[in-house]
């Protein structure tokens, strides 16, 4: 199987943050026997992320994104994954409850903007994130081109 990593964040693209996640992801893929063919970094722009994901789905079986699934307006990975996989972005009350529970577990109240994290591509499988508040997810391409696994970015 061919794998690809897509690192998302303008701060990564411009060198303002060191990309430590890509190295860990590359090592983890190697350890489970997946061949990493490409690693791309793209800024926080829905159109460009969608373009990168479409190319990745054309040439790889497993795409792992890191970044852009937080609560701010520049966190547009969810929509870009939905676009690239041919799915609608839908609101999940279950995910909203999970995000709220995560905040309660760390003694904080969930802010209104954190509800953005309850959007997910239709049919995607939510994945737990024990380290943060952003729900991760796995989305299968509607056309059968591959899967996209979306993980949080560099803190």
Regions found by a protein language model. Give the residues of each.
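Glycine-rich phosphate/diphosphate-binding loop of Rossmann-like nucleotide-binding domains
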Residues: 1-39
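Short catalytic-loop micro-motif centered on adjacent basic/acidic residues
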Residues: 38-40, 65, 150
């Amino acid at each position: 199987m061919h794998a690809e990593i897509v690192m998302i964040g303008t701060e990564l693209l411009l060198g303002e943050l060191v990309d430590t996640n890509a190295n860990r992801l590359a090592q983890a893929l190697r350890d489970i026997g997946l061949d990493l063919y490409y690693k791309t970094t793209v800024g926080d722009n829905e159109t460009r992320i969608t373009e990168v994901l479409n190319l990745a789905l054309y040439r790889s079986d497993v795409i792992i994104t890191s970044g852009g699934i937080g609560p701010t307006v520049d966190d547009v990975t969810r929509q870009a994954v939905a676009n690239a996989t041919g799915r609608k972005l839908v609101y999940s009350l279950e995910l909203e409850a999970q995000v709220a529970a995560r905040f309660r577990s760390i003694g904080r109240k969930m802010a209104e903007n954190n509800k953005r994290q309850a959007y997910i591509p239709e049919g995607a499988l939510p994945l737990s994130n024990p380290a943060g508040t952003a729900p991760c997810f796995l989305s299968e391409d509607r056309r059968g081109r591959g899967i996209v696994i979306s993980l949080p970015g560099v803190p």
